[in-house]
Every structure is written in C-alpha cells, then in structure tokens.
C-alpha cells in the first residue's frame, strides 16, 4: 500500500493508507453483529472528524458527510454506498483520556486539535442510513499530542492523543500484557473504513511478525488508519492499523472493492507494545 491524498472532496484525508478485502468481505455494522465481545470492543473506537462536518442540534449533533457512492464513484452493487463518509482517521481509547491512532493521521494536517474532534458511537442503525446523530457527550476535543513516532519503513506509526476531558461512560481497551504475539492469532478490526460509521471486520489472522509491526489479512480501507486491532478471542488490543493494499478497483465508469485471496494479506499493524511503557509511566 502507498500513501495517498484523496482530494476529490476534502483538502485533507488523514487515512492516506488504502487497504483491501481478503477473501469474503467481513465488514459489518455494529447493529448487525451478535458477538458481545465485539460489540463491547466497538465502544472503544473513535472517529476523527472535521468540525465543519458537524451540525449541533442541541444535546446532539448530526454528521452527514459525503455519501460513499459519491466519494468513490461506487458501482450500484457495492455495500454501504449510501452511508456518509465523514471521518478522516480512526482511533482507539487506551486510557480514560487518551486515544491511540496512527502518527501519519497527525502528520498530514496542521491545527489538528483546533479543527478536528474525536467522536465515539459514530455508527448507524441500518445499512442505508444517510446521516448519523451522536450525543454531544460523546464528542471530545483533544488538548495535545503526547507521543508521536513515525518511521513507516520499519513499521513505526503511532501517536497518543490526550483529550480535554475523561471518557467516563465506557471502558478503554485492554492492551496485550505479557503474552507474545503468535502467527495465526485470530484478529478483529474495529474502526472507520473509507470514513464510514463504525465497522467490525473479523475472520483475519497474523501472517507475519516483524520487529515493530505485523502483517495481517484484515479487511481494511483508507481511514481505518488508527483502528484498533484486537485478539478475536481475548479482546486484548494487539495494535493499530497503519497501512495496506489499494482498496478500490475501477470498472469502466464506477469502482468496486478490490479483492485478494487470504494468503495475500498485506495490512500492516503497529504492535501495541511500542506504547505500553510510555502509557504506564504517563499514567503514574
């Protein structure tokens, strides 16, 4: 995968890391998932959304965004085509006031904390929902970037963002402890592919382990950058998505999701151990 600016609609798209589908498309909306572990883990995901895309209606705000079908000129048979693409990156709550995301999300734009907010429960109730309403209590401003390290060539691409107030209505993600990451470990990805409302994608596993990251066959897309990658059995946070293969393939006048076989997985996940020591010291 390569880094790519989508300039069709917005000036900045921090998810500049396109990805793809491996085997069957396993992306699901939260309402369509029955696994209680996955539903609970989805509460830790947050969407980084530009303030200009928010319409305050009192105690809640409406996020409309651009329909996915217009953003990428999708073919009529493509999934989620009517849902809004509003997010610019994904993030995962790793402390009561700290979000972990990809460092490149904070490398592509200035004044991030001034122009963007982090939104929890950015999700739909049915597949063709064209806008999303979220309680203002679940919209958080950031105060500062407390850690940012990026060297894509060696698999380093992570940042920790401090929020202005603590998140008190949900638990943060449990980081993998002493257990060593193993090949074929089952994984689930939770975030905002193509800027969409929260999607859960499982039925993936670890293909290769590198020094600072690992390679998987997760069904991921641009703007999944920073999405939490969890162990599908224990629920532990294994890392965050950084990069992968190209996600869309042109077919004449429209585009479709690009599909690969499972063994061709090339989605890079930054290992959560790179931030564990910093977090433990910071929270003291």
Please provide the spans of the model-predicted regions.
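C-terminal cap/linker of serine protease catalytic domains
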Residues: 124-125, 132, 137-141, 168, ...
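RNase H-like polynucleotidyl transferase catalytic core
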Residues: 215-218, 244
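Serine endopeptidase catalytic core focused on the charge-relay Asp
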Residues: 18-33, 40-80, 84-86, 94-96, ...
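Short beta->alpha transition motifs characteristic of CBS
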Residues: 102-106, 191-194, 222, 239-247
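N-terminal signal peptide
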Residues: 14-16
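Catalytic nucleophile loop of clan PA
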Residues: 92-93, 220-242
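Sec-dependent N-terminal signal peptides
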Residues: 3-12
């Amino acid at each position: 995968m390569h880094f790519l600016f989508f300039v069709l609609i917005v000036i900045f798209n921090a998810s500049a890391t396109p990805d793809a589908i491996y085997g069957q498309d396993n992306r699901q909306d939260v309402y369509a998932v029955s696994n209680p572990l996955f539903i609970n883990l989805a509460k830790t995901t947050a969407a980084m959304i530009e303030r200009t895309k928010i319409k305050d209606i009192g105690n809640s705000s409406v996020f409309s965004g651009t329909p996915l079908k217009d953003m990428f000129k999708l073919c009529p048979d493509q999934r989620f085509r009517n849902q809004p693409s509003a997010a610019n990156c994904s993030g995962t709550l790793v402390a009561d006031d700290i979000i972990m995301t990809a460092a490149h999300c904070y490398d592509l734009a200035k004044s991030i904390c001034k122009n963007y907010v982090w939104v929890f429960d950015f999700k739909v109730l049915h597949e063709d929902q064209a806008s999303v309403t979220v309680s203002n209590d679940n919209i958080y401003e950031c105060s500062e970037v407390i850690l940012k390290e990026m060297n894509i060539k060696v698999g380093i691409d992570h940042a920790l963002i401090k929020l202005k107030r603590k998140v008190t209505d949900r638990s943060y993600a449990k980081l993998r402890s002493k257990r060593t990451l193993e090949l074929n470990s089952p994984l689930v990805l939770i975030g905002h592919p193509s800027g969409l409302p929260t999607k859960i994608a499982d039925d993936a596993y670890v293909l290769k382990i590198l020094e600072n990251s690992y390679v998987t066959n997760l069904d991921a897309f641009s703007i999944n950058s920073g999405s939490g990658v969890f162990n599908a059995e224990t629920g532990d946070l294994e890392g965050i998505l950084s990069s992968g293969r190209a996600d869309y393939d042109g077919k004449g006048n429209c585009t479709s999701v690009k599909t690969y076989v499972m063994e061709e997985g090339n989605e890079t996940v930054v290992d959560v151990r790179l931030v564990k020591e910093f977090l433990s010291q910071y929270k003291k």
